[in-house]
Amino acid sequence: MKVYFAIIAICAIYGMGISGTRAAMAVPFGGIALFILVSKSWKSFAFSTLAFIAVFSFFNFTTIGDGNQYIRKMRSAFRPSEDASYQVRVENRKKMKGLMDEKPIGYGIGLSKGAQYGPKEVMPYPPDSWLVAVWVETGIVGLMLYLLIHGVLFAWCSWLLMFKIMNQRLRGLLAAWLCMNAGFFVAAYANDVMQYPNSIIVYTGFALCIAGPYIDPVMQKEDEELERERKEKKKRD
C-alpha cells in the first residue's frame, strides 16, 4: 500500500504542476499545516514540519529547477509581486472594496456572477475566488459569519480527532479528509474551488469527523474481534 500511495502522490504532484493554476499549491500546504497541529505522534509531527519547511524553502528561497516550466509556474505562487495576473486581481479587489463599502450585506446570493439573469444591480468586476464571491454576495457581515462558522468547524473537528477518536485507523482516515478540507479553504482565497462537486466532498468530511466519536467504538470493537481471531488462529496453527 505504501508503494501505491507513493505513486498516487507523485501523480497528484505532477497533475498539480500541469494544471495551470497556482492556487493548487495551497492545497498540500494547507493540509500539511493542519496535519502538524492535529498529529499526536512526535514522529509524524517532526516529519511533517520538516517536509513543510523544506518544500516552502525550495519554492520561496531558491531558483532550482526554473528551467522546467512546471516548477517555474508553481514557484510563481510564492512570488505574487512578479505575477501579472495576481496584480490584476489586486487592482480589481481595490475597486470592489470601494463598491462594497456601501453594501455591508452584499449584492445578494448568486449575484457575484449572475449578470445573465438581468438583476437590477450586479458587481461589475468578476470575483476571482470563492471567498471574494462570498464577500460580494453577502457583504462583510456574511463573510465574517462564513469564516466564523468554518473556523468553529475546523476547531471542533480537530478537537474530536485529537481527544475523542481513539481508533488509529479511523483517526488517520478522518485526519486526511479534514486536512484536505483545510487545503481547499486556503485555496479558496485565490480560486473558486468550492464548486460542484468539491463542496459535497468537503462537507461530507466535516460530517464524518463530527460523527467520528459514534463510529469509533464500532471500529474499535471490530478491530479487537479481528485481533482476537488472529491470535486464536495463530494458537491453532
Protein language model regions, located:
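Alpha-helical transmembrane segments of multi-pass inner-membrane proteins
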Residues: 1-38, 158-159
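Short, aromatic-rich membrane-interface segments at the entry and exit
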Residues: 4, 23-25, 43-49, 195-200
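Hydrophobic transmembrane alpha-helices of multi-pass, membrane-embedded glycosylation machinery
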Residues: 9-10, 25-37, 51-55, 151-153, ...
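A membrane-periplasm/extracellular boundary helix in multi-pass inner-membrane enzymes
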Residues: 10-19, 36-80, 97-101
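Juxtamembrane transmembrane-helix termini
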Residues: 18, 25, 41, 152-166, ...
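Hydrophobic transmembrane alpha-helices and their immediate junctions
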Residues: 33, 140-185, 211
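Long extracytoplasmic/lumenal interhelical loops at the membrane interface
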Residues: 78-138, 161-162
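Transmembrane alpha-helices of multi-pass inner-membrane enzymes
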Residues: 174-234
